[in-house]
Each structure stands twice: as structure tokens, then as C-alpha cells.
From Swiss-Prot:
It is an enzyme of class 7 (translocase). Its EC number is 7.1.1.-. One of its GO terms (biological process) is aerobic respiration. The keyword NAD applies. It is a multi-pass membrane protein. Keywords: Cell inner membrane, Cell membrane, Membrane, NAD, Quinone, Translocase, Transmembrane, Transmembrane helix, Ubiquinone. The keyword Repressor does not apply. It comes from Xylella fastidiosa (strain Temecula1 / ATCC 700964). This is NADH-quinone oxidoreductase subunit H. NDH-1 shuttles electrons from NADH, via FMN and iron-sulfur (Fe-S) centers, to quinones in the respiratory chain. The immediate electron acceptor for the enzyme in this species is believed to be ubiquinone. Couples the redox reaction to proton translocation (for every two electrons transferred, four hydrogen ions are translocated across the cytoplasmic membrane), and thus conserves the redox energy in a proton gradient. This subunit may bind ubiquinone. PANTHER family: NADH DEHYDROGENASE SUBUNIT 1, NADH-UBIQUINONE OXIDOREDUCTASE CHAIN 1.
């Protein structure tokens, strides 16, 4: 178990419980803030990292001012906050405002069941996988409402594209997670991680036996977040900004925040489901206690999870800088004719591997 959790968080939890029901409520609010605030800050620095990384790929410098580029995202946030929120004359104002909130709320609520280390999770729900599928499916309703309430042909076309794309790839993602559930024997995300523990390091991870499902989930995750090369929802050369074309100021920033929060979420989930979460790739190869500062290298811990997340978050940026946008019909064909049949076949293969003992559950 994480030493930091035992020494700091657990005594703090017990102190809050001493205040009875009020303490339970305050502890829950504190845990929510401990996830929400770092997530918002992470989105800000993720935007800076995206601009710098794309700049390097284009042989440019990227952001260089406002704290040498480090605080450029915060400057952009303040700029958006002070901009006027304009409402189209024929828009449905109530739904126009609710839509970005409906998109943002599920992207934050999904983090409730995401574990960062052993017991370091807001809600260690036994049906965490189902909860995640439900939350990640709700965001599209905000996009549809935004397209409809804007009373714009461009916005409505982007919303319809988003609805079809999310429905298409949500099925493939769900089937991919069925394979993970079969291999782990649990819907609890912490137990899914521990099912990949063992003495063989990364050879015990689900990445190897479930590699086709890993590819399907990763590509579907990119499509779910409407990122390049699946960004037909907001294709600049076709429909300007899609469902966001009529938004400005702070309400536009909410869509922006939801998109990047979802990108970070998908990076976390793919690390948890297929790459052992916080487990070390050399776990079981080396043992012993040297120093708490370096023991995580072979024993595992949240730094490993963050390193894996950083890799996938950077891959999002690489996709944007490298690949051209797919046509709408190509995206639909990939989802329905390739990914869904592939996941169905590999679910059966996974069941056979579990039955025959090829996939062994960890500790």
C-alpha cells in the first residue's frame, strides 16, 4: 500500500470522521476538490505541452512568452473569461447555456472511480466499469443540445456527426472492456489493476493477450474525444467549429475543458485496463527496500501511472500533428465493419484463454 496514503491521508480521513455526518460530507467534498483542482490545472499545462510539442514537430518554438510559455494556457483562460458571451438571436438560450455544462459534468464525474494507487480512489465501486461506460456516454448529449440550441446549420451538422460517431465507437469500446472484465474477473478498477500483478513484470499485463482490444480501445478513445484524425465533428475546413461555432467566452472554455479532461481520462483508463495502472514493468524482477524515493521503480506506485498517462496524452498530440482527417464514411466503416467484429471475435478468444489458464489473474 502507498506509504504516503498511510501516513497522511488515512489519519486525515479518521480526523474528519470524528465530526460525524458533517465530517463525512466534508471529507467527500475534500476528495472531490483533490481530484477536480489538479485536473483543471493538468488541462492547462496539457494545452501548453500540446502547443510546445506540435511546435517542435513543426520545427517551431511554440509558446515562448508569459513565463517562457509555461503560463500561456492561464493567460488564454483569463482572456476567455473576460470575453463577452454572445447568444445567437434565434438560439434557445436556456439549453444553449446548459449544453456545455452537460458536456463538462460527465467528464469530471467519471473520475470518481479512477484509482491512482492502492486505495487512492474517490469511490472504490465494485461496478466502476459500468459507471465509467455510463458517464463517458453522457457527454454526447451536451454536444447534441449545443448543436440544436444554436439554431445554426453548421452547429447542427457537427452535432449529428458527433452523435453517430460516439454511438459507433461506444459499442466497440464497450466490447473491448468486456474482454478486460473477463480477463480480470471484476468490474472494480483497482481489482482490474491487481489482476495484472505478478512476478513477470509487464508480461503479466493485459496488453499482450488483449492486444487487439487494446488497439480498438485506444483508437476508439481518440474517436470518442473527437480528436484528430477523427475530428470531423469540428472540422475547420468543412463546418468551422461544428457544435461550438456559436459559442464564445467562458461557455466556449467549458467545451474546451471537457475535451481535454476526457483526453486525460482516456489516457488514464487505457493505462489501467491494459498497462497495469500503477504497477511497475519490472515488478517481481527486483525486490528489496532501499529508499521510499526510488522503491516505486520496482514495487510500483502512482509515478508509473503518471508516466504511462503522459505517453498516451502525448500520443494524442502526435496524432494531431501527423495524420490527415478521415472522411466521415471512412470513420463509420472503421467502427462498424472492423472494430465491432474484431472485438466480438477477441471476446471469445479471451474467454478461451481464461478457461485454459493462459491468462492468470494476479494477486
Amino acid at each position: 500500500m502507498n506509504t504516503w496514503f498511510l501516513n497522511v491521508v488515512d489519519p486525515l480521513h479518521q480526523w474528519f470522521l470524528g465530526f460525524g455526518d458533517i465530517g463525512v460530507v466534508l471529507w467527500t467534498v475534500l476528495k472531490i476538490l483533490m481530484i477536480a483542482i489538479p485536473l483543471i490545472v493538468s488541462v492547462a499545462f496539457y494545452v501548453v505541452w500540446e502547443r510546445k510539442l506540435i511546435g517542435w514537430m513543426h520545427v517551431r518554438h511554440g509558446p515562448m512568452y508569459v513565463g517562457m510559455g509555461l503560463f500561456q494556457a492561464f493567460a488564454d483562460v483569463f482572456k476567455l473569461l473576460f470575453k463577452e458571451v454572445l447568444y445567437p438571436s434565434k438560439a434557445h438560450k436556456a439549453i444553449f447555456v446548459i449544453a456545455p455544462l452537460l458536456t463538462l459534468a460527465p467528464s469530471f464525474a467519471a473520475w470518481a472511480v479512477v484509482p491512482f494507487d492502492t486505495k487512492l480512489v474517490l469511490s472504490n465501486a465494485n461496478v466502476g466499469l459500468l459507471y465509467l461506460l455510463a458517464m463517458t456516454s453522457l457527454g454526447v448529449y451536451g454536444i447534441i443540445l449545443a448543436g440544436w440550441a444554436s439554431n445554426s446549420k453548421y452547429a447542427f451538422l457537427g452535432a449529428m456527426r458527433s452523435a453517430a460517431q460516439v454511438v459507433s465507437y461506444e459499442i466497440a469500446m464497450g466490447f473491448a472492456l468486456v474482454g478486460v472484465m473477463i480477463a480480470a474477473g471484476s468490474l472494480n478498477l483497482s481489482q482490474i489493476v491487481m489482476a495484472q500483478a505478478g512476478s513477470s513484470g509487464f508480461f503479466d499485463w493485459f496488453l499482450i493477450p488483449l492486444f487487439p482490444l487494446f488497439i480498438v480501445y485506444w483508437v476508439s478513445g481518440v474517436a470518442e474525444t473527437n480528436r484528430s484524425p477523427f475530428d470531423v465533428v469540428e472540422g475547420e475546413s468543412e463546418i468551422v467549429a461544428g457544435h461550438m461555432v456559436e459559442y464564445s467566452g467562458s461557455v466556449f472554455a467549458l467545451f474546451f475543458l471537457a475535451e481535454y479532461a476526457n483526453m486525460i481520462l482516456v489516457s488514464f483508463l487505457i493505462s489501467i485496463f491494459f498497462l497495469g495502472g500503477w504497477l511497475s514493468p519490472i515488478q517481481g524482477w527486483v525486490s528489496g527496500q532501499v529508499s521510499p524515493l526510488i522503491d516505486w521503480v520496482w514495487n510500483g506506485g502512482w509515478p508509473w501511472l503518471l508516466l504511462k498517462v503522459l505517453f498516451f496524452a502525448s500520443a494524442y498530440i502526435w496524432f494531431r500533428a501527423s495524420f490527415p482527417r478521415y472522411r466521415y464514411d471512412q470513420i463509420m466503416r472503421l467502427g462498424w465493419k472492423v472494430f465491432i467484429p474484431l472485438t466480438i471475435v477477441w471476446i471469445a478468444v479471451t474467454a478461451l484463454m481464461v478457461f485454459s489458464g493462459v491468462i492468470q489473474k494476479g494477486v
